[in-house]
Amino acid sequence: MAKKTVAAKKRNVKVDAYGQAHIHSSFNNIIVSLANSEGQVISWSSAGKMGFRSSKKNTPYAAQMAAQDCAKVAYDLGLRKVKVFVKGPGNGRESAIRTIHGAGIEVTEIVDVTPLPHNGCRPPKKRRV
């Protein structure tokens, strides 16, 4: 006898006019998530979700497409102003912020929260091309 599958119940998130935008930009991908003022995620997108593969995921254009997809959903739900938190050393940080602003969501503040080691792990060796 087959087990019955139960669909996961969708969480109701209260959307305010003011929220947060988190942009995580690594060397391989970029992830954009828009949240309300409590930090509950309203919408998210990434370059991989938008159909970019391999090295094309870490381009400013891929970041622009991911931010546009994410911002459109959040704007339709009622998000109007965001405080942007940027993390990571990747390429598409500025283009993602510009795209969020261009989608009609006002950017009030930009904070860089990139983690910096106090001489922690050994970094990867330099590439020889």
UniProtKB/Swiss-Prot annotation:
Record-linked InterPro entries: Ribosomal_uS11 (IPR001971), Ribosomal_uS11_bac-type (IPR019981), Ribosomal_uS11_CS (IPR018102), Ribosomal_uS11_sf (IPR036967)
Gene Ontology molecular function: any one: structural constituent of ribosome
Keywords attached to this entry: Ribonucleoprotein, Ribosomal protein, RNA-binding, rRNA-binding
Cross-referenced SUPFAM superfamilies: Translational machinery components
Gene Ontology cellular-component terms listed: ribonucleoprotein complex; ribosome
Family: Belongs to the universal ribosomal protein uS11 family.
Function noted in UniProt: Located on the platform of the 30S subunit, it bridges several disparate RNA helices of the 16S rRNA. Forms part of the Shine-Dalgarno cleft in the 70S ribosome.
Assembly behavior: Part of the 30S ribosomal subunit. Interacts with proteins S7 and S18. Binds to IF-3.
PANTHER family in the cross-refs: 40S RIBOSOMAL PROTEIN S14/30S RIBOSOMAL PROTEIN S11 (PTHR11759)
Protein's recorded name: Small ribosomal subunit protein uS11
Gene: rpsK
